[in-house]
Amino acid sequence: MVSMLPKADAATGVIRKSYAQLPEVVNVPNLIEMQLQSFVWFQEEGLRELIEEISPIKDFVGNRLELEFIGYEFREPRLSEYECTQRDQTYSVPLYVKARLIVKTTGEIKEPFDLFFGDIPLMTALGTFITSGTERVVVSQLLRSPGVYFTISDDPATGRPLCHTNLIPSRGAWLEFETSNRDVISVKIDGRRKIPVSTLLRAIGYSDDLDILNLFEVIDNDPERHYIQSSIDRDPLIKDEISALIDIYSRLRPGDPPNADNARKLINEMFFDPQHYDLGKVGRYKVNRRLELPSREVGENRALTREDIVAIIQRIIMVNNGQDTPDDIDHLGNRRIRTVGELVQNQFRIGLVRLERVARERMSIVNLEMVTPSALVNIRPVVSAVKEFFGGSQLSQFMDQTNPLAEITNKRRLSAMGPGGLSRERAGFDVRDVHYSHYGRICPIETPEGPNIGLIGSLATYSRINRYGFVETPYRKVYSKLKNNDKKLVGLKLKIEISEKGKVLAAAGSTISEDSFKLISKLPECDISVMPFVSAEVKYMPADEEDRYIIAQANTRLDEKGYFLDDRIEARSAERYVVEPPDKIDYMDVSPKQIFSVAASLIPFLEHDDANRALMGANMQRQAVPLLRAEAPMVATGMEREAARYSGQVIFAKHAGVASSVTSEKIIIRTAEGGHDEYLLKKFVRTNQGTCINQHAIINKGQKIAAGQVLADSSATENGELALGQNCVVAFMSWQGFNYEDAIILSERLVREDAFTSIHITKHELEARDTKLGVEEITRDIPNVGEESLRELDEDGIIRIGAEVGPDDILVGKITPKGETELSAEEKLLRAIFGEKAREVKDTSLRMPHGEWGKVINVRIFSRDSGDDLPARVNKWVQVWVAQKRKVSVGDKLAGRHGNKGVISIIAPVEDMPYLPDGTPVDVVLNPIGVPSRMNLGQILETHLGWAGHLLGFRVATPVFDGADDTVIEDALARSWLSAKAGAIDMSPENKRPSADAHKAIEWIKQQGFDGKKIFDEKHPGLAKEVSLKLWLKDMGVDASALSGAELEKKAYDVSSQSRLPSPIVGKSVLRDGRTGETFDQPVTVGNMYILKLIHLVEDKVHARATGPYSLISQQPLGGKAQFGGQRFGEMEVWAMYAYGTAHNLQEMLTIKSDDIAGRAKAYESIVKGEDVLQPGVPESFKVLVKELQSLGLAVEVINEEVKIAPSEKVSSLNEGNLPASDEISAEILPETLYANTEDISEDSMMSVIDADDQDLVVSSNDEEVSENDERS
């Protein structure tokens, strides 16, 4: 079969043609391995380390009791994952620690006892935690590693670069070394005052000047600068160990009387005692590497040693003298990752330390004869520390479950924030920026756009985390020399000839055979130079180790045996890009996508997109809503299958066999061994974001199943590939101005065929409790509710499954007893006759929120009577799930994968949409102006290649930086044109997609005088393009048989420009307007693009209110959709009303529509009665203003509560200066009438006042001034 139609993948049935040039050397690793491995480490090692740290616990004196912990075990979880999500419980396991108690006074060893240490949240198989019924993810933290760091900063006075050093432990006091411009090296201990470094050296045992100078004589040898001598001379009074100890002690403990023994003890505790000072495994490893100390076992001594301090000072001198380079603190060799296991361990440690303190206190007071381990240990601090971490830590996040990609990304996220990390405010530009050491470790594309940019990142596809917490990435080893006894030599080419005593054993350039290897291996041990080749051996390296090597790119040209084809190779060496001969290359990248995260490597033609837009594309894919009819992309990258596999939403067969039962609920496979594998399917499960997970089988009963085959798809996968959007026919053109500013025009066909329809599920809950006034009751018998409202409720007052519900519909009927007053004699009589029925109850039913609707898909009832475990005072608990089927609508946000996003502005009838020459209307019209300035040309290439794939009936995989190039796309378009010309494309409506008959196309091409088989063969790039252009020019009446290459393209371009008809390779079509039938002026780019519907749906955002809740203080409507609030009419909106002079509108906005309490009640009444709305009164905010002024100590009060507006003739007489009596003033000019105690108000004040002690202050609205000595006031 010709390669035009690639073979369908047997396991999935999807035809996907890959344009990858490079082989997959390393498979994509398990994408959630980091989470799983880390938690397993915590369970097996992390917890053991903690228990060893605190064991044994002794009393304060150390001679009464000793409590030893000798082991621990996790028991079985009490509830399954499913039960926990249903009942809002935490998925956890009980931890039991084996404790042994020793009574020191009698020597009695009590029997080991299993102590319950609380329930520890357990990680699910998908790397998440279920706490209180919701799935959460613990994000890994990226922070500065413990170790020693040498940095250089310029001295402000002299401009000379000076070394500054920090020694950061995992736990303990920091040491900071500084160099002054007078060559004195000083040290700060734990941030206290500086002391010369010579004082610290004397205090740790180098007491004599000569001893100190001898330590540094080899290094401190600059004739101009003598750092150690300058430091000694800086403090001439301190000449021995005791004076140095006392000096340091007096700085660290300023109030205590200094004493040499106490000082020695303090310094030993502070730096050399593992209980108080711990570099940690990582810190010790980093210190040893940086100071090039003799490599001893890392776990051996995690406290400081004298030698460490000396080595640090030696390095400071070397950095100052330019003999050593300073460190880059943003380098990934100096930043490590705290994964889940370590974060939980740190939190657990806090709880254990509190537990230890309580146990020691109890040991001192407990009765020795009656004592048991459980009497000493209080587990509450441990339980609360762990609970606090999972519930409230910045790093424990509500899992983003919008779609499968969002889940994976959330689990692979790295945050530089959180406890012990950076804050948004303090983080500068350098920390946020992309660093060369991120290559292959942290994605340079995927990061948020807001204030967290650069502080939150994502692990690259192939990266992993080593045991010290550093990110590693894989490289292929390049060999140019091998030992003469290495069996790898067989089959390799020699670079130089090998001879022994003048006899040539193997000539240069020859291939080493088995025989020649035997001769070479008998030579004395030596290195054999071979032609440099890339082996299959893969090595994972952290960033600091990688800096030592020269590394070639993944797309370096190799032959089939791994030899380099070029004489000069482009490569990286630390931050430099170099071109080197092959024998200098040490390693080579494993894949072009190793640089990027999962989300970024899902963007086809990423190499043609601007980084800013690629960032948006990567982030928006995570916001795509799973659609009702999931469709994998026409143009993919090949990562879709990996993302779907590790999301946990696709079900794969564990073993080969035959499908014995396939239903919507479960699949049963009968294996070859005769056993049965059962797979349960998730049906309409609500995610954290309200989207829907619904698995459905894609196999049939009786079908043979291979191991690893896809059995069931989820709501966002198709045939085991991620399917977040829809393939649409798009045209880039403007249409009636409806796609102005990135707006999108959609065809009604997409709405009708449910292309962008999605399911959203909401969960509603109600509890019936015991209250002080009586028991709440779930019932159908609700006061003042008509039968119409109860028609969908069952006899218990709970809605039936399948009911269609709308805003304010009752889901669960509930009545609550009202507070009862003293009953009258008549009421007591009624109560005695009719029993409880007559009592006062209020309706507290669960209703659908405003603006929501849907269909009830599930109801769960938990009752104390049925033995369910419910919280205190709760008798019954009902949960109702409501699903909405939302069609796409105007205002919804759509996006491509290249950062091209927009809002739907119109859904046009199919008959009005622009249509192709064959009558096919386009689905989406996008604005062409949105492309050039955004520089995301990937969308255009995707459109072209997608169109060719659409017409020829196959899908495409074009991996990032290793995909289809221009020639390939032009050839694909040319083949689709030739097939259409030959009538080989079946566009019949009963087919879901077009399909092409390759043989028919080849026959037709043969009739035109060309070799059809060659044209449809990928091995002849450019041939299809050339043939299609010649045939097109022939159709246009131009003879181009003698033309080829650039001349042919130039001719086709000229003819196309003159005729305004597109050539076959430009991916354009002549479109007609669906309303008029006339052709558009220019040919339009038409193709197939993958479009996503994002979770920013207009239905969740649109909101309107009539009457509703008000704020208690301001009496203004609440704000926001969640509170059913009003629209804020702010300062700027008021200015707009001023500008239009709409005084009445403005008045009612600020009064009866807002916080004029009496006015709004009257207005409502008037509207109901159909009368004119009365005049507004004083807004409540005026009273708030008065109260605020009073709170400042001003005696402000409203003189007359009865606010009246002055008649117009009164106002005009006031304006002419005719002042009324003061009691008239206070009654008439009212909205701003105030009373105050005032001393000094300027005469030319705009407001007129009466100035006298303790007199009324009247503010009038006219501009005339009130006479100061007017007697009437």
Curated annotation (Swiss-Prot):
Recorded catalytic reaction(s): these are:
RNA(n) + a ribonucleoside 5'-triphosphate = RNA(n+1) + diphosphate
Give the matching SUPFAM superfamilies: beta and beta-prime subunits of DNA dependent RNA-polymerase
For molecular function, the Gene Ontology terms on record are:
DNA binding; DNA-directed RNA polymerase activity; ribonucleoside binding
One GO-annotated biological process of the protein: DNA-templated transcription
> Which Gene Ontology cellular component annotation is one that this UniProt entry carries?
DNA-directed RNA polymerase complex
Per the UniProt entry, the Enzyme Commission number(s) are: 2.7.7.6
Tell me what this protein is called: DNA-directed RNA polymerase subunit beta
**What's the encoding gene here?**
rpoB
